[in-house]
Structures are given as C-alpha cells and as structure tokens.
A protein has these predicted regions:
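Hydrophobic transmembrane alpha-helices that form the core helical bundles
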Residues: 41-43, 64-142, 146-150, 155, ...
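Transmembrane helix-loop boundary segments of multi-pass membrane transporters
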Residues: 43-48, 118-134, 154-163, 283, ...
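TM-loop-TM module centered on a large, flexible mid-protein loop between adjacent transmembrane helices
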Residues: 85-86, 92, 124-129, 233-300, ...
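Membrane-interface loop-to-helix entry segments
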Residues: 120, 133-181, 193-196, 234-235, ...
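A generic transmembrane alpha-helix motif of multi-pass inner-membrane proteins
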Residues: 361-366, 395-458
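Membrane-interface "cap" regions at the ends of multi-pass membrane proteins
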Residues: 1-40, 44-50, 63-68, 79-80, ...
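Helix-loop-helix junctions that connect adjacent transmembrane segments
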Residues: 4-13, 49, 53-56, 128-136, ...
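C-terminal membrane-solvent junction of multi-pass transporters and transport-like membrane proteins
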Residues: 159, 320-327, 370-419
Length: 458
C-alpha cells in the first residue's frame, strides 16, 4: 500500500525522521480497523481467556522479529519496490513478478474486500439490511469508491492522520469504557468442542491485526542515524502496539466475555451497547465506518497502481496499464480491481462470513511470500558477504531463522485450518505463472510492482 518511467531512479537520500517521528508513523501504519473485527475470530479459536490475551502478546513479539529482519533488508537494499525488489535480488525477476501478480490479484483485492466487509458489518449496526446487509454494504462501497478514484481524487496525508486519530480514539473508548464502565460480569466461557480450538488460526487473525509492520521497516531510509535508532524505534513501537491491543482486548473480554466475543460480528458496537447504551454503540459504529471508508479509499487508490505496473512489465492486457490523463488515474486498472474485489465479496456473501473468508483467501499467499523474503535475507548475506550493511539484524542468523520458522508455520496454519477460500487464493496465484511468459524482456530488475505516475502520500 503503499514514478512514470520503468527505470531505476537514483535520488539524493535525505534523513528527516527523528526517533519520535518514526515511532508515531509505525504505530499509525499498524493500527487499523482490523482490531474492531478480529477479536471475535481469535476468541473462536482459543480455549481460555488466558490464551486469548497470550496470542496478542505473542503476535506483537513476532511482529518485532519480522520488522527487525525487514529493517536490515530495507537499509541494505533501499528501494521503493520493497518486497518486489528484495525478491528480485534474491531469486530473480520471475519470482518478483509472480509476487506482483499475487499482490494485485490476491493480497490487495482481498484486502479491499476485507476492509469493505468490516465497513459493512458496522454499517449494518446503524442501518440493518437483512442477513446479506454487510455484503451489500461492502459491494456498494467498492463500487462507489472505485468510481470516485476513476474520476480522480486527491489523497491527503492529513486525512489519513485524522483517520488514524479516529481509530486510536475508538480503541481508547473501548479501553476506558471496558475497564471502567459498569456492566454485569459476563458468564464463564463454555468449553469449545474437542478439536475446535486452533492456535494457528487464532494467530492468523492476530498477525493480520498487526499488519503494516513490514511497511514500518522501510522507515530506515528516512530515519536519522538509522543504524543506531531503527531497532529502538521498532522495539518501542511494538511495545506501544502490544499495550494498545492487549488493553483493548482485556476491555472487550471484561464486558463481553469469551462467548460474547465469539458470537459478535461487531465487537466494539456490542461492547459499547452494554456499557453506554444504544447511543454509545451508534457513536463508535459511526467512527469505525468513517475510518473504514478512509482505509478502503486508500487501499483502492494504491491497489490499482499494481495493475498499472504489471501491465508495464507484461505484454498481456496492455490496456490495464493505460493512464487516464483526464482523471490522473489508472482507470482500467481500477475497474479490473473492482471486478475482482466484487467477485470476492460474492464469495464472502455465500460463506456468510465475508471478512473471515477474505483472510483465508489472502493468508497462504501472503505468508508464502513473507517466508521467501525471510529466506532471501540469508541468501543475500551469503551471496554478498562484503556488502556494507547500514543496519544488521541482531542475533543473526537466529533472528531470521526464527522469522522463517514462524512464517512456515503460519503458511501451514493458513492452509490446514482454513476453508475453501485459501485454496482459491492459491489457485489464483498458480494461474499467474503462465503470465510470466508474457513479461517484457527489457524491464529493469529494480522496477517495483507499485510503480505509478502518482504515488500515495500518507
């Protein structure tokens, strides 16, 4: 999520971020609307209140390990392409292009549909539209905001900052009302049927909520005295995130209980309804819908740039890469992206749990490429032993090995504990393999898949 010629651009590096700036940006990148939906799915996959809180702490520690590995890669190989560039250097252009396909067809479109479902779940709290209301809201929101982006829109970093403030404000409200509000204590949680609990599945939803840490690692390129400060930034940011998420989940647990969480599709609204009445539920639902609208708009805006760049790298479907000069947008890419996202919404509507289906759709592909990036760090260390490393991951090779083992387990869990949506995601990834036959022969290895004439400023 995150320039017009498909060439490498060398720029004069400027270091503008203080340690405080970087911590604030990291927290802003990671804190998102997932925390208002995933707790119920985590609760459904753990056996006890202790395990429910423990997985959120574990998720934060895994986030820190991954961010430290990414910090070395982004410092040693600074480039706007991120994972695309790392994969190009470690494995060659075909693997990187397959990642570009995966990002455009699975990861980004799945994220769009997932955000739309969160929007739909909370919009349905305000104006119910029946059992398929969340899916209907999700589809309408994708169509509306794709149309807005086709016409052309200005992305404002101040708008994104405001939305982050709303999200953190909603979390703060959950914590304050949950810990200090008055409500009848929830009943003890019923035992799950044997075999129902799956820590691996719970961790998938937890780590989704912590998503954004891989973007935070790219702060290395703009951080003052990065070799000394990046680890401190990542550790402090992670501690803040763990505190935010653990406090929010303790608050939710204290009001709704484990069974109440398991039964809820809108945990923040249901919690506020118990401690502050319908007015409280309405206010927090409006705040989350507004934040979801902003997130959805930004995700749609950046996602279509992937299709634009893929068309620049491939000879197939060149019209997808056409830039609409009138609206200053990749209109065809936006339309294709919306079609794929709407198909995913339809799949989610059939399963009757759209957000969960979107997580299952994207998780195996996401964790598979994350594993390749982790292995790539070791590959590049071995292949380029004399390369200057502005920042070195601590406890090498233990830290990247631990990261790779975690990614491998998450890849296994995302296939073993999920439904048919995960197989659909893997099938879509496999369908992209023949497209490599249509790649342009003179594209530069450094070309990122998110290259576009106008980048999102967040």
């Amino acid at each position: 999520m995150h320039q017009p010629q498909v060439t490498r651009v060398d720029t004069v590096q400027t270091y503008t971020l203080t340690r405080f700036d970087a911590v604030v940006i990291m927290v802003g990148l990671v804190v998102g609307i997932g925390i208002f939906r995933t707790p119920s799915l985590v609760a459904a996959n753990v056996e006890s209140e202790f395990a429910f809180i423990a997985v959120w702490v574990a998720g934060g520690l895994i986030t820190l390990i991954g961010a430290l590995c990414y910090a070395e890669l982004s410092a040693a190989h600074p480039h706007a392409g991120g994972e695309y560039h790392f994969l190009s250097r470690a494995y060659g252009k075909p693997v990187a292009m397959l990642f570009g396909w995966a990002r455009g067809s699975v990861i980004q479109t799945g994220a769009i549909a997932g955000v739309a479902f969160v929007l739909g779940d909370y919009a349905a709290q305000l104006v119910p539209l029946g059992p398929y209301g969340p899916s209907l809201y999700a589809a309408i929101s994708i169509i509306v905001f794709t149309g807005i982006n086709v016409v052309g829109t200005i992305q404002s970093k101040f708008l994104q900052i405001a939305m982050t403030a709303i999200e953190i404000g909603a979390i703060a409200a959950i914590v304050l009302f949950g810990l200090f509000g008055s409500a009848e204590p929830p009943p003890p949680a019923a035992a799950l049927p044997p075999g129902s609990a799956a820590i691996g599945m719970a961790m998938i939803f937890v780590l989704l909520t912590y998503g954004g840490w891989n973007e935070a690692a790219y702060l290395t390129g703009e951080l003052k005295d990065a070799p000394r400060n990046i680890a401190k930034v990542l550790m402090l940011g992670t501690v803040i995130l763990i505190a935010l998420y653990v406090l929010a989940n303790v608050a939710l647990l204290s009001i709704l209980g484990l069974d109440g969480l398991r039964a809820s599709d809108a945990v923040a609204a249901d919690m506020m309804r118990r401690v502050a009445g319908p007015a409280g539920a309405t206010i927090v639902s409006i705040a989350i819908v507004v934040a979801a609208i902003s997130t959805l708009n930004a995700t749609i805006f950046t996602g279509a740039r992937v299709y634009y760049a893929m068309a620049r790298d491939m000879t197939l479907l060149p019209s997808v890469g056409e830039w609409n000069e009138r609206g200053k947008t990749p209109a065809n890419g936006l339309i294709l992206q919306a079609i794929v996202a709407l198909i995913l919404v339809a799949i989610g509507a059939i399963t009757r749990d759209g957000f969960k289906a979107m997580v299952e759709y994207t998780a195996p592909v996401f964790w598979g490429f994350l594993l390749l990036v982790g292995i790539g760090l070791i590959v590049l260390r071995i292949r380029e032993p004399n390369r200057a490393l502005p920042y070195k991951v601590p406890l090498y090779p233990l830290t990247p090995i631990l990261f790779c083992v975690t990614c491998g387990y998450m890849l296994h869990a995302s296939i073993a504990y999920t439904g048919v949506a995960s197989l659909v995601g893997l099938a879509v990834l496999a369908a992209g393999t023949p497209l490599l036959l249509f790649r342009r022969k003179h594209t530069n290895v450094d070309t990122p898949p998110s290259t576009a004439p106008r980048a999102l400023t967040e």
